Curated annotation (Swiss-Prot):
Chain's gene name: WDR53
Region feature (Disordered): 273-311
Repeat (WD) residue spans along the chain: 1-38, 43-80, 85-123, 127-166, 173-225, 232-270, 314-355
Highest taxon above the source species: Eukaryota
Protein name as annotated: WD repeat-containing protein 53
Similarity comment: Belongs to the WD repeat WDR53 family.
Organism: Homo sapiens
Length: 358
């Protein structure tokens, strides 16, 4: 059972982040921002003027009390010890910001917005050094690659995933998730599958910097490998029965958390699955499509009409959590030395699940 952190918000929580020193921050609808201690006690709270939703929060790794928060078109820089007073703020995006990402050297901050643009802010000189405009719809998620401070990946509701280098204003590589799935989508469909286009909601890069994952509205989880100036899809599997709202690699591992609109949270071992695929002599594009079965999944209350093995394309999850609420944000972090999953959903509380076995 999850431990519930309450008392910090009165509206749905939209985003979470943790500092290296155990502080946590959460942003919610209506401009609410709360800081938490490791025991789930609210330590501070502020409400931004304008009451725009707080869509992304991000601690500075080198200065654990410094916090970045996006609300509306604004990025605020705060001291978590005194949230009422902003240290600085930037208004560089023209539409609502959906996601923030810091590069590893902490001199650049990326902000992705509803216009599809990604603004790259030089934090030392306090000015925009790049405006990356290639997404034709909302840019939902952006992430700098660890160990590569000039490289980032992004995804959006235009169903596109992009690899960028800040040396260039154009993406190095683009894939359209819907087009790439055309061949695989042939054959029998599960109910409602055709109604869900591959709108990309969330992106996460593993600590190595070369493996990243994307979650989309079609319920699929895709894992890519960066190969120089292009990427290759290593895996693509049906991870959820409805849209995948969140993907999140655990720190220093290839364990991948995914959360969906189906109210489920799942843990996958991306590394072992990629290794298995590489050892298989069958090319991805020519693999047999699994036959649909009528078995229900073991150990879960589900109406899925396919077996676990078939639904995930022979990829079995390490852990399944029936959370029961649409997942807004997932965070894997250590609390008091133990790995935990923190979940923000449509409620005003934060759910904490221990990951003792890992």
């Amino acid at each position: 059972m999850a431990v519930k952190w309450t008392g910090g918000h009165s509206s749905p929580v939209l985003c979470l982040n943790a500092s290296k020193e155990g502080l946590l921050a959460s942003g919610a609808e209506g401009g609410d921002l709360t800081a938490w201690g490791e025991d789930g006690t609210p330590l501070g709270h502020t409400r931004f003027q304008g009451a725009d939703d707080v869509t992304s929060v991000l601690f500075s790794p080198s200065c654990p009390t410094k916090l970045y928060a996006s609300h509306g078109e604004t990025i605020s820089v705060l001291d978590v010890r005194s949230l009422k007073d902003s240290l600085d703020h930037f208004h560089v995006n023209e539409e609502e910001i959906n996601c923030l990402s810091l590069n590893q050297t902490e001199n650049l901050l990326a902000s992705a917005d509803d216009s599809g643009a990604i603004k790259i802010l030089d934090l030392e000189n306090k000015k925009v050094i790049r405006s990356l405009k290639r997404h034709s719809n909302i840019c939902s998620s952006v992430a700098f690659r660890p160990q590569r401070p000039q490289s980032l990946v992004s995804c959006g509701l235009d169903m596109q995933v992009m690899l960028w280098s800040l040396q260039k204003a154009r993406p190095l590589w683009i894939t359209n998730l819907q087009e790439d799935e055309t061949e695989e989508m042939e054959g029998p469909q599960s109910p409602g599958q055709l109604l869900n286009p591959a709108l990309a909601h969330s992106i996460s890069v593993a600590s190595c910097g070369n493996i990243f994952s994307c979650g989309a509205e079609d319920g699929k989880v895709r894992i890519f490998r960066v190969m120089g100036v292009k990427c290759e899809q290593e895996l693509g599997f049906k991870g959820h029965t409805s849209g995948v709202s969140q993907v999140c690699f655990l720190p220093e591992s290839y364990l991948l958390l995914t959360g969906g609109n189906d109210g489920k949270i799942t843990l996958w071992d991306a590394n072992s699955e990629v290794e298995k695929k590489q050892k298989s002599p069958t090319k991805r594009t020519h693999r047999k499509k699994p036959k649909r079965g009528t078995c229900t999944k073991q150990g879960g209350n589900t109406n899925a009409s396919v077996t676990d093995e078939e639904e995930h394309g022979n990829i079995l999850p390490k852990l399944n959590i029936e959370h029961g609420e649409k997942v807004n944000w997932l965070l894997g972090t250590k609390i008091k030395g133990h790995q935990n999953i923190l979940v923000a959903d449509q409620t005003s509380c934060i759910s904490v699940y221990p990951l003792n076995e890992f």
